[in-house]
């Protein structure tokens, strides 16, 4: 505000001085007419009004910019890739991007037409990875479902037998080289400024449309935690039709297999096994500074020596232990949303919020989320 005041007055004085030098009327013409006081009052009033108006407009633009600017203005046109997000995950890569505060998405939540503020920790699902070669995770599932979206009409996706927490999410995504359409919860409906929509058997959504600027799309999702009845032509128990895909392991050490056996030896169900493996990481610590023993794989060094790492190590280790114990599991890469903007009432997701977690298939419950990573101090973000 102070800057606006000084700048405005400087511009006004400069204009007056400029007009004075341009004037051809002699100064005597203005003497004795009693206008100076009136002119000064009017000038002060008009300039003050303009300053107040400019400040109000600035505040309005600041608050509403995420709602309009990201959807329709070409931002970040260099299409730089998100360093912490790709369709593969290699141990150690996340450490380089967690300090990057660049904004990836802004998300507005509404429920029944009213502003909805979700819980502080929100996971935005991006890509699911099922194959591990000892260092890198990749996806081997082909596209299962492909259709054309008519912007303004949208697509009905899943249906939920007993919806309990249905919200609308308006997503404004920056330009970057990633075709994925991130989702939070079970997506029931999707619409956006894209035509082609694809989904694989891991329920990962993406578009093959060429990028022409920031992406804007709307989701209606059920963000409660319950079983899902699929509206797509896929049986409910399909994950069990190809369990080997989610039990695949590279050649890992007998020490790792022994750890999985020891942790789950008294567990009677897959849910118990998953919980016992999750509990094993309770005393591990979070760090971005990774060290590797040249004589061991990065994962073994993490499990048996260092016991410190970032989310990719925790998620990778849990999936490997689950699969060794016979529990189908997969690694998920996306973002965790923790930063809420109180001025504009929207969620901010930054590159430093990139995250990896685990989905394990539990009979009777389906794919269940487990996050073995301890809290990251950099993600404890106050409301802004």
Mark where each language-model region is.
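Helix-boundary/low-complexity linker signature
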Residues: 1-384
């Amino acid at each position: 505000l102070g800057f606006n005041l000084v700048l405005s007055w400087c511009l006004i004085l400069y204009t007056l001085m400029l007009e004075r030098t341009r004037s051809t009327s002699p100064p005597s013409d203005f003497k004795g007419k009693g206008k100076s006081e009136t002119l000064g009052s009017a000038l002060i009033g008009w300039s003050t009004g303009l300053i107040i108006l400019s400040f109000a407009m600035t505040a309005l633009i600041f608050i509403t910019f995420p709602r309009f600017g990201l959807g329709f203005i070409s931002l970040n046109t260099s299409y730089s890739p998100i360093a912490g997000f790709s369709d593969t995950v290699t141990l150690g890569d996340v450490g380089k991007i967690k300090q990057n505060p660049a904004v990836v998405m802004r998300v507005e939540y509404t429920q029944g037409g009213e502003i909805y503020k979700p819980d502080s920790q929100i996971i935005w699902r991006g890509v699911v990875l099922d194959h591990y070669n000892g260092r890198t995770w990749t996806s081997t599932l082909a596209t299962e479902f492909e259709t054309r979206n008519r912007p303004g009409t949208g697509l009905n996706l899943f249906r939920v037998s007993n919806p309990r927490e249905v919200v609308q999410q308006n997503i404004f995504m920056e330009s970057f080289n990633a075709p994925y359409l991130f989702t939070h919860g079970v997506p029931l409906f999707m619409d956006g400024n894209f035509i082609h929509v694809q989904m694989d058997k891991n329920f990962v959504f993406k578009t093959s449309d060429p990028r022409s600027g920031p992406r804007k799309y709307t989701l209606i999702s059920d963000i409660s935690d319950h079983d899902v009845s699929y509206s797509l032509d896929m049986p409910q128990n399909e994950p069990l039709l190809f369990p080997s895909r989610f039990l695949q392991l590279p050649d890992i050490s007998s020490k790792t297999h022994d750890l999985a056996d020891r942790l789950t030896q008294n567990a009677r169900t897959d849910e118990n096994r998953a919980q016992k493996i999750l509990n094993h990481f309770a005393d591990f610590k979070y760090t971005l500074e990774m060290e590797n023993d040249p004589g061991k794989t990065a994962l073994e060094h993490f499990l048996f020596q260092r016991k410190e790492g970032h989310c990719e190590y925790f998620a990778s280790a849990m999936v490997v232990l689950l699969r060794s114990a016979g529990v189908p599991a997969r690694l998920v890469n996306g973002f965790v949303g923790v930063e809420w903007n109180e001025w504009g009432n929207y969620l901010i997701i930054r590159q430093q919020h990139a995250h990896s977690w685990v989905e394990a298939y539990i009979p009777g419950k389906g794919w269940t989320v487990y996050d073995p990573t301890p809290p990251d101090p950099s993600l404890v973000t106050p409301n802004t």
